[in-house]
UniProtKB/Swiss-Prot annotation:
CDD domains: CheD. Its EC number is 3.5.1.44. The lineage of its organism: Bacteria, Pseudomonadati, Pseudomonadota, Betaproteobacteria, Rhodocyclales. This is Probable chemoreceptor glutamine deamidase CheD 3. Probably deamidates glutamine residues to glutamate on methyl-accepting chemotaxis receptors (MCPs), playing an important role in chemotaxis. It comes from Dechloromonas aromatica (strain RCB). GO terms for molecular function: protein-glutamine glutaminase activity. SUPFAM superfamilies: CNF1/YfiH-like putative cysteine hydrolases. Keywords: Chemotaxis, Hydrolase.
Length: 170
């Protein structure tokens, strides 16, 4: 665990929000069926987090990117990665969320969470970004804190026994 910087900049993401920051930043959020991806550049110690609610939409021409949608939140990442003079493959990713939180009118679980997770994995793979760890699925909420200075993500998941935990090594 790395010590926090003396001048810490804390950011809380609501659903649909995105933040990319410097090494003095801690980004936090609370997830259910939504998904957060963290990207971290280990050499430059910069990174960001998105918090998307749905996979995608039919985006109107000339519409601004909307972080509520995973495909567009990832485009925001790519813009910031390029603006930092870096390439996507230089980053490490972590993926969180995608719980089964919602039921449809018939009482059947909706698959919003699993679809959000699948999209996150696809976007990372398509951009050659290493997925270091993921904590996905289950049925509970997750609280995340991403320390950009170290790349560490702290996770609180009270109903954690039924979630899938994977890392790059098995």
């Amino acid at each position: 665990m790395s010590a926090a910087p003396s001048e810490l900049h804390e950011v809380f993401l609501n659903p649909g929000e995105f933040h990319f920051g410097e090494s003095n930043t801690r980004i936090s959020t609370l997830l259910g069926s939504c998904v957060s991806i963290t990207l971290w550049h280990p050499r430059k110690r910069i990174g960001g987090m998105c918090h998307y609610m749905l996979t995608e939409r039919k985006r109107p021409p000339n519409a601004a990117l909307d972080g509520r949608f995973g495909s567009e939140a990832f485009e925001l990442f790519l813009q910031h990665v390029a603006a930092a003079g870096t390439r996507p493959g230089e980053y490490q990713a972590k993926l969180f969320g995608g719980a089964n939180m919602l039921t449809g009118p018939t009482g059947k679980q909706m698959d919003i969470g699993p679809r959000n997770v699948a999209l996150g994995r696809q976007l990372l793979a398509a951009n050659h970004i290493a997925l270091m760890v993921e904590h996905v699925g289950g049925s509970g909420r997750r609280k995340l804190h991403f320390d950009v200075w170290s790349g560490d993500v702290w996770l609180a998941f009270p109903q954690g026994a039924d979630a899938e935990i994977r890392n790059a090594h098995g």
